[in-house]
Amino acid sequence: MRPKLLSVEAALFLALPELARAATRKFDFEIGWVRANPDNAFERPVIGINGQWPIPTIEVDIGDRVIINAHNNLGNQSTSLHFHGLYMNGSTHMDGPAGVSQCPIIPGTSFTYNFTVDQPGTYWYHSHTAAQYPDGLRGPFIVHDKDFPYAKKYDEEVVLTLSDWYHDEMRSLIPQFMAKSNPSGAEPVPKNALMNETTNFTMSVQPEKTYLFRVINVGAFAGQYLWFEGHKMQIVEVDGIYTEEAEAEMIYISAAQRVSFLLTTKKDTSKNFPIVASMDTTLFDVLPPDLKYNSTGWLVYDKKAEKPVPATVDSLNPFDDMTLVPYDKMEILGKPDKEVVLDVKMDNLKDGKNYAFFNDITYTEAKVPTLYTALSAGKDAEDPAVYGTYTHSMVLKKNEIVQLVVNNLDSGRHPFHLHGHAFQSVYRSEEEAGIWADANVTEKNLPKTPMRRDTLVIYPNGNIVMRFKADNPGVWLFHCHIEWHVISGLIATFVEDPLALQETIEIPKNHLDACAAANMPTKGNAAANTEDFLDLTGENKPANTLPPGFTPRGIVALVFSCICGILGVAVVAWYGFSAPVGSTSAGALSAGLVENDSGDVHSAQKGPQETVVSPTGDARSH
């Protein structure tokens, strides 16, 4: 037995330097409203931390323990924090989505996140409650790595965020979006694009130096094309996964994606160069005349030289991220044990509003956070039914290889994000290619070492195929990261090895207190039933479906037909009952008063003869 003991001691001794380097990083966050005007066009309330906005960048080292004490000072909104891209291995209860892995943090209360970071790379943190993060609660989360393979190739590191920006708060935009008057589901178009939360980003650079850029799209909606005039990028990381170097002149970054690259400056310092980020306007249903879809910054070599206007580009041809090769050259996972196929569509329900669906299910939050159902359901936790119909939960067995197929039956792009994992991106079709089942692609056609990331763009009416290993017990969302589509229900849930969760996860009292404050149960199925976990009576449900034959286009046509009909009848009635020229009702004349169109009362007077166009188009005078 002595040799075995010595080997353990030796292992502990060798681990001591790593343990010594790991630290506990503690953050106290007071989350509250501040005012800001990032685009110099409109000052508005934004959600800041500790009285400041933009919110702080969190920087830690791999192996560090992170403790965040979050206190909600918003007064009028609940909140939560999600750490986008972090696997939260062994800590699924720290993932952050309210109603999924925790209860919301209601105003005036606090919540503690406590987890260890065991992966390097570029991430971000943001609210995961009620589509709140576009109001400003979003910031970078950087995990440094002493073993970064490109550490000796750069001189300086830069974090660069891109985002769209709205002048109205989400609490006013959401009711406009989810309204009967918007049956086609047209998403609100942002007012501006920001670069590092400003429209005037400048970066002083030195000649012949190499910079590591960590770029994060923290926006709510728009993907962005990014390029540096006169310079090339060497991509070295996407979504926390190191890659082999890949040269690019232009990249596309969807909402929630991250790309890191090396950029080497020129020897000549006589000129400055534009940095251009251009929003993907194909996502917008309309292009308002005041829309500013480009954001321009500058690489400044000479502060005295002019900052040139960006040159016009003939076309937008970004680097294809599907061609990236992971640095560790991890090979494609083997034959899938389980295939999940999700069909994306947008449609209306009986309340007249437009919703988003996976396989005809639009996500509706359960009465009990899904994780808490998994922890309290006993052996029933392996039955997807206990999580409710409308959380769209799928139970995964330990270590099974999952092939996740998404067929986009919609005419727009979507960035799909998986919590708890980086998946292998094994296939992406072109636009209008149809569904995966018709693709005629075999295993030998798939890449040997596919790119891995946690957020992948699917093209209009196309498909994507991803693979991952169910080796991280937890409750993990899969959803579109366009925040408007999160609101409208484009979410599914993976419940991974729930019996292992029951053995390893203990919910802290601080988290249970948050549920008590929010008056939310912490045990039971989706309907909060603790007696019979298969009885879903009383579960939260979306509106009923429409009768067959109704489509968004048909609803729009019906609505406008009704409006036109009502207006037509009103005009005819008004014309038929109008008084002869020069006359006014006796009562109004006797009082010397008449009402104008707005209802204001004015002294009676004869106006000039008016010409009115009848519903038939004839001009009539009265």
From Swiss-Prot:
Keyword Transport in annotation: yes
SUPFAM superfamilies registered for this protein in UniProt: Cupredoxins
GO molecular function, one term: copper ion binding
Binding positions for Cu cation 4 per the UniProt entry: 414, 480, 485
Biological process according to GO: cellular response to iron ion starvation; reductive iron assimilation
Keywords assigned by UniProt, alphabetized: Cell membrane, Copper, Glycoprotein, Ion transport, Iron, Iron transport, Membrane, Metal-binding, Oxidoreductase, Repeat, Signal, Transmembrane, Transmembrane helix, Transport
Chief site of localization: membrane
Cytoplasmic side: 575-622
Glycosylation sites: 76, 89, 114, 196, 200, 294, 440
Inducers of expression: Expression is up-regulated during iron starvation.
Disruption phenotype: Produces wild-type amounts of siderophores and growth at the same rate as the wild-type under iron limitation, but accumulates high levels of free intracellular iron. Does not affect the virulence.
One term under GO cellular component: high-affinity iron permease complex
Residues annotated for Cu cation 2 binding in this entry: 84, 126, 481
InterPro entries, alphabetized: Cu-oxidase-like_N, Cu-oxidase_2nd, Cu-oxidase_C, Cu-oxidase_fam, Cu_oxidase_CS, Cu_oxidase_Cu_BS, Cupredoxin, CuRO_2_Fet3-like
Topology versus the membrane: Single-pass type I membrane protein
Region (Disordered): 597-622
Function of the protein: Cell surface ferroxidase; part of the reductive iron assimilatory system (RIA), a siderophore-independent iron acquisition process. Required to oxidize Fe(2+) and release it from the transporter. Seems not to be involved in virulence.
Protein name as annotated: Iron transport multicopper oxidase FET3
Organism field: Gibberella zeae (strain ATCC MYA-4620 / CBS 123657 / FGSC 9075 / NRRL 31084 / PH-1) (Wheat head blight fungus)
